[in-house]
Amino acid sequence: MSIVVITGAAGLVGSMLRPRLARPGRTLRVLDIAPLTAGPGEEAIAASVTDMDAMTAACRGADAVVHLAGIPGEASWERICDLNIGGSYVAFEAARRAGVPRVIFASSNHAVGFTPRSDFPVPDYAFPKPDTYYGVSKAAVEALAAMYHNRYGMDAICLRILSCFPKPLNVRMLSTWLSPDDAGRLFEACLTAERPGFRVAFGVSANTRGGWVSLAEARALGYQPQDDAEAYAAEIIAEHGEPDPDDPVLRCLGGEFTLPDDQVPRR
């Protein structure tokens, strides 16, 4: 019997991952401040990722933490610091206090969002070039994860996820889509990899129009992507037109998060 804690379990990625990480003999301890109902093989906990006592209690007896909680996009510096950075500190520290040996952190391509197309494919351990406060928070927590590995021996895997949605929504996502099933494969690989140590890997499907980022580290963890956004290409291009290489959204990895402040989508 194993126990995996999932923070932010009521969110989009958490909701897609939960059924895909369910296994006989595995309990998913799903935690969120938003209402959620425990499914088969789950224990639901209503708590904030910023609550150290609640998080430490949730981590007791667990084998791994999948840390998804946080604001999933740009917001004020104060909110980003409180939830994305502060909440991530709580997640790692609670795991340490409870003796959890492994944390898998949902980082983002926005940690390196200002990487230009001329530098594609982006290496797994590319130096941070965050495109927003949100991207800064992801880069900061990658550094935090490295510290928890080097100081405490914790396995800490940071997944720079690109575009994880039920299906691609626009032309950019024909290159950056991470399908729900491939997300499940990626996180499962991270849960079962033998003594991974500290890793930074990108999360994306095997898209025909991909090649934007390295998949070497993800594959080294055992990830084998099977899905391809090209299955949706005709539908997307009919709605949005062919990709324009001069489109500012396509000039850097971070897409619309690299646009001027008043055009960046906010939460």
Protein language model annotation of sequence segments:
Residues 4-24:
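N-terminal Rossmann NAD(P)H-binding glycine-rich loop of SDR-like oxidoreductase domains
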Residues 161-167, 177-198, 206:
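Alpha-helical substrate-binding/gating segment
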Residues 199-201, 208-224, 236-265:
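Conserved C-terminal active-site "lid" loop/helix of NAD(P)H-dependent oxidoreductases
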Residues 82, 117-156:
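Catalytic helix-loop patch of NAD(P)-dependent Rossmann-fold dehydrogenases
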Residues 50, 79-90, 98, 128, ...:
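Glycine-rich NAD(P)-binding loop of the Rossmann-fold in SDR/ketoreductase-type enzymes
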Residues 37, 47-83:
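NAD(P)H-binding glycine-rich loop region in Rossmannoid oxidoreductase-like domains
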Residues 19, 88-89, 139-146, 150, ...:
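Conserved active-site helix of classical SDR/Rossmann-fold NAD(P)-dependent CH-OH oxidoreductases
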Residues 90-129:
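Conserved Rossmann-fold NAD(P)-dependent oxidoreductase catalytic core, especially the SDR/UDP-sugar
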